[in-house]
Amino acid sequence: MARIAGVNIPNHQHTVIGLTAIFGIGTTRAHQICKTTGVAIDKKVKDLIDADLEKLRDEVGKFVTEGDLRREVTMSIKRLMDLGCYRGVRHRKDLPVRGQRTKTNARTRKGPRKSGVQLKK
């Protein structure tokens, strides 16, 4: 298995698909990386030579990926919550942030249904 940006890339996959295993690299960026490094898109990871892997490592290193990107996203959400803006409030309440309806849907974000309010006896 090839190791790029701290992630083990599966040997049986094509280079482009294998690069998408890295958090922060999707298919578009993976194609871009392969094009700039000159690595064949349809080549399997196990068939790459060390020089190709080194080129890929250098190119991937130019982007914010994995832990740094996760930290950046978390800090961005925390900043919204500290500001108290609408998006921050929605994050704090664990509700959909981008204007989706919540009266009937949004079960994934809200979690399982809570039982009705019980009256005191």
UniProtKB/Swiss-Prot annotation:
<comment type="similarity">
    <text>Belongs to the universal ribosomal protein uS13 family.</text>
</comment>
<dbReference type="InterPro" id="IPR018269">
    <property type="entry name" value="Ribosomal_uS13_CS"/>
</dbReference>
<dbReference type="GO" id="GO:0015935">
    <property type="term" value="C:small ribosomal subunit"/>
</dbReference>
<comment type="subunit">
    <text>Part of the 30S ribosomal subunit. Forms a loose heterodimer with protein S19. Forms two bridges to the 50S subunit in the 70S ribosome.</text>
</comment>
<dbReference type="InterPro" id="IPR027437">
    <property type="entry name" value="Rbsml_uS13_C"/>
</dbReference>
<feature type="region of interest" description="Disordered">
    <location>
        <begin position="94"/>
        <end position="121"/>
    </location>
</feature>
<keyword id="KW-0689">Ribosomal protein</keyword>
<dbReference type="Pfam" id="PF00416">
    <property type="entry name" value="Ribosomal_S13"/>
</dbReference>
<dbReference type="GO" id="GO:0000049">
    <property type="term" value="F:tRNA binding"/>
</dbReference>
<dbReference type="GO" id="GO:0019843">
    <property type="term" value="F:rRNA binding"/>
</dbReference>
<dbReference type="GO" id="GO:0005829">
    <property type="term" value="C:cytosol"/>
</dbReference>
<comment type="function">
    <text>Located at the top of the head of the 30S subunit, it contacts several helices of the 16S rRNA. In the 70S ribosome it contacts the 23S rRNA (bridge B1a) and protein L5 of the 50S subunit (bridge B1b), connecting the 2 subunits; these bridges are implicated in subunit movement. Contacts the tRNAs in the A and P-sites.</text>
</comment>
<keyword id="KW-0699">rRNA-binding</keyword>
<keyword id="KW-0687">Ribonucleoprotein</keyword>
<dbReference type="GO" id="GO:0006412">
    <property type="term" value="P:translation"/>
</dbReference>
<dbReference type="GO" id="GO:0003735">
    <property type="term" value="F:structural constituent of ribosome"/>
</dbReference>
<protein>
    <recommendedName>
        <fullName>Small ribosomal subunit protein uS13</fullName>
    </recommendedName>
</protein>
<dbReference type="InterPro" id="IPR001892">
    <property type="entry name" value="Ribosomal_uS13"/>
</dbReference>
<feature type="compositionally biased region" description="Basic residues">
    <location>
        <begin position="100"/>
        <end position="121"/>
    </location>
</feature>
<dbReference type="InterPro" id="IPR010979">
    <property type="entry name" value="Ribosomal_uS13-like_H2TH"/>
</dbReference>
<keyword id="KW-0694">RNA-binding</keyword>
<dbReference type="InterPro" id="IPR019980">
    <property type="entry name" value="Ribosomal_uS13_bac-type"/>
</dbReference>
<keyword id="KW-0820">tRNA-binding</keyword>
